[in-house]
């Protein structure tokens, strides 16, 4: 198995679903791995968990959206799956 390609595929999937509520199981299923093995491989190759990656990317995108100044904080929070602004 090409682990780098598998993790890149998972990252592409996560990037495409930043505004969706996705789970570790969803991502693992996409790359045909168990949740345990996916999280372990992702953590080894990226030095962060999939949840940390999603949280950082969502926060980064939310910040960029807010910097544009055209969206309300509550709208951006809900867009990126935050429960409250």
Regions found by a protein language model. Give the residues of each.
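Terminal helix-turn-helix DNA-binding modules in bacterial transcription factors
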Residues: 8-25, 44-80
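Key DNA-contact positions within bacterial/archaeal DNA-binding proteins
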Residues: 36, 85
């Amino acid at each position: 198995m090409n682990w780098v390609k598998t993790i890149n595929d998972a990252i592409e999937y996560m990037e495409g679903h930043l505004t969706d509520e996705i789970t570790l199981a969803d991502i693992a299923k996409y790359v045909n791995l168990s949740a345990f093995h996916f999280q372990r491989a992702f953590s080894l190759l990226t030095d962060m968990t999939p949840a940390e990656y999603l949280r950082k990317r969502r926060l980064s995108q939310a910040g960029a959206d807010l910097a544009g100044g055209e969206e309300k904080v509550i709208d951006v929070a809900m867009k990126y799956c935050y429960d409250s602004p």
